[in-house]
């Protein structure tokens, strides 16, 4: 009986920990993460204070923070080839990182670090030098900056069969030296690295290539981490938020269900299906059942996105900034529909898969510059600064904890719905106008469309909609309008 009670206690403790790892630790009603891909720490700190906090963003996913190999031309993916756990990259050093985390936490913006637990750098001719000056010999699996040696890695092999669990989890993903997370020593180094970031005030981690590591090894590592640092405003006993990169199209040998009990999982099917719909390859009317009916994970387990730094570079159904009208419609739907833990992308311009972030002649990452409207102009795309996107972050905050209701569609690609009595969204992806009296579910009054403009000094700078005492308003979205979406909420009432 004593053994049974102890086993039950340990089981419940494990379940409690994994449940806690689904909590993003947001402030107030904020509930959207932005990925400031390849930004410098000093620029993120300023962005938290001057833009993200005033507009209600909840958190920032940052690029990998630990030392990486220096590759010719400085492609973005060099950040995913670590050679030590020293906190020095082209984004800045440890002091600058710590300053950024503190300043962002001070204004209610949580920081989530993209972490590389699966591997170290791939092969390199001779001695490689990292961004902190550390030398390594990746071809010999020698990384003295940790230190790691060959005994800390799985034997080298190539993934040739993605239906072979052994290959997926113990061979080398695109040639990257595959760490043995079952080793006590490797586990200790990974835990030490993550705990240091927790000490500096981060709220959690995006775990890169999670499906290439055994779930039981990750469970041990996550369960061994420290609680979040209360000196950065986290409650006592708060656990780091975990979201794991698991690409699962529904027929994978290693499935997302092996990981969703440990933390949230990146829902790639969401990205693919929302792209198909807003590219016109699937009628928007079918989105009424969006979510688990589409085979997605449950809402609290799914990290959702229109695109990410990887799949925005691939051909196919996924939308990116290069299709701005459809991209903004898809993002508006993403942030308005009550499903998932939402993340929006903030990119830099690219012409090919390997394009580096904006950099100067000395290959230093440059800071974003802004025009008079606040949009980025020097190679940074900054989708999060597009009015149509940051306005929907405010919409999502305004309607938090409300249900979807009053769905309407025209049987094709015009849809609308309410979020309780706090918000209304309409979308027109047809080649003809949407002109219709629709139920907005809002209290009577005049409302600004936050897509086409803003509420400033008691007046709308874009479209406005009069809502009658029954909650109905006349909605017009022309087929040739700049944006194919209209959004109203209670905080944009004149």
UniProtKB/Swiss-Prot annotation:
An MF annotation (GO) of this entry: metal ion binding
Localisation: Secreted
Primary localization: secreted
Binding site for chloride: 206, 308, 343
Intrachain disulfide bonds: 48-104, 157-171, 376-382, 418-441, 448-460
Gene Ontology BP annotations: carbohydrate metabolic process
Assigned keywords, A-Z: Calcium, Carbohydrate metabolism, Chloride, Disulfide bond, Glycosidase, Hydrolase, Metal-binding, Pyrrolidone carboxylic acid, Secreted, Signal
Cofactors named for this entry: Ca(2+); chloride
E.C. numbers: 3.2.1.1
Signal peptide extent: 1-20
A GO-annotated cellular component: extracellular region
UniProt-listed Gene3D superfamilies: Glycosidases (3.20.20.80), Golgi alpha-mannosidase II (2.60.40.1180)
Pfam families: Alpha-amylase, Alpha-amylase_C
Reaction(s) the record says it catalyses: Endohydrolysis of (1->4)-alpha-D-glucosidic linkages in polysaccharides containing three or more (1->4)-alpha-linked D-glucose units
Annotated CDD domains: AmyAc_bac_euk_AmyA (cd11317)
Residues that bind Ca(2+): 118, 169, 178, 212
Active site location: 208 (nucleophile), 245 (proton donor)
Cofactor comment: Binds 1 Ca(2+) ion per subunit.
Pyrrolidone carboxylic acid modifications at: 21
Site (Transition state stabilizer): 310
Subunit structure: Monomer.
Family: Belongs to the glycosyl hydrolase 13 family.
Name under which the protein is recorded: Alpha-amylase-related protein
UniProt source species: Drosophila lini
Gene, per the UniProt record: Amyrel
């Amino acid at each position: 009986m004593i053994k049974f009670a102890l086993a039950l206690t340990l089981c419940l403790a494990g379940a409690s920990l994994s449940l806690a790892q689904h909590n993003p630790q947001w402030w107030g009603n904020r509930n959207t993460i932005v990925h400031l891909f390849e930004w410098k720490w000093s620029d993120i700190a300023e962005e938290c204070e001057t833009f993200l906090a005033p507009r209600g963003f909840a958190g920032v996913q940052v690029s990998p923070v630990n030392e990486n190999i220096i590759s010719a031309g400085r492609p973005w993916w060099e950040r995913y080839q670590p050679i030590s756990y020293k906190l020095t990259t082209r984004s800045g050093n440890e002091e600058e990182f710590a300053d950024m985390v503190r300043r962002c936490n001070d204004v209610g913006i949580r920081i989530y670090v993209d972490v590389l637990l699966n591997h170290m750098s791939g092969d390199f001719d001779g001695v490689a030098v990292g961004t902190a000056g550390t030398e390594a010999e990746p071809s010999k699996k020698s990384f003295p900056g940790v230190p790691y040696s060959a005994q800390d890695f799985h034997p080298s092999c190539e993934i040739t069969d993605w239906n072979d669990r052994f290959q997926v989890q113990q061979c080398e993903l695109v040639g990257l030296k595959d760490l043995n997370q079952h080793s006590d020593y490797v586990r200790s180094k990974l835990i030490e690295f993550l705990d240091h970031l927790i000490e500096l005030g981060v709220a959690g981690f995006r775990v890169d290539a999670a499906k290439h590591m055994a779930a039981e090894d990750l469970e041990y590592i996550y369960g061994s981490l420290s609680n979040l640092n209360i000196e950065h405003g986290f409650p006592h006993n708060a656990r780091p938020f975990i979201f794991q990169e698991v690409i699962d199209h529904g027929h994978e040998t290693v499935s997302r269900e092996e990981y969703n009990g440990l933390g949230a999982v990146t829902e790639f099917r969401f990205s693919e299906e929302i792209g198909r719909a807003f590219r016109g390859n699937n009628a928007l009317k079918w989105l009424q059942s969006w979510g688990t009916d589409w085979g997605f994970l449950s809402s609290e387990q799914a990290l959702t996105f229109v695109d990410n730094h990887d799949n925005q570079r691939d051909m196919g159904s996924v939308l990116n900034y290069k299709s701005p009208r459809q991209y903004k419609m898809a993002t508006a739907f993403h942030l308005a529909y009550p499903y998932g833990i939402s993340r929006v992308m903030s990119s830099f311009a690219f012409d090919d898969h390997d394009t580096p972030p904006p950099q100067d002649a000395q290959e230093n990452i440059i800071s974003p510059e802004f025009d008079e409207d606040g949009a980025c102009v020097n190679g940074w795309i900054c989708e999060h600064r597009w009015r149509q996107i940051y306005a929907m972050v405010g919409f999502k905050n305004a309607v938090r904890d409300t249900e979807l209701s009053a769905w309407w569609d025209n049987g094709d690609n015009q849809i609308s719905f309410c979020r309780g009595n706090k918000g209304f969204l309409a979308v027109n992806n047809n080649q003809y106008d949407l002109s219709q009296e629709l139920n907005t579910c809002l209290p009577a009054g005049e409302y600004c469309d936050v897509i086409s403009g803003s509420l400033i000094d008691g007046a709308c700078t874009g479209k406005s909609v009069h809502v009658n005492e029954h909650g109905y308003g006349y909605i017009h979205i022309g087929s040739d309008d700049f944006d194919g979406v209209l959004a109203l909420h209670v905080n944009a009432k004149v």
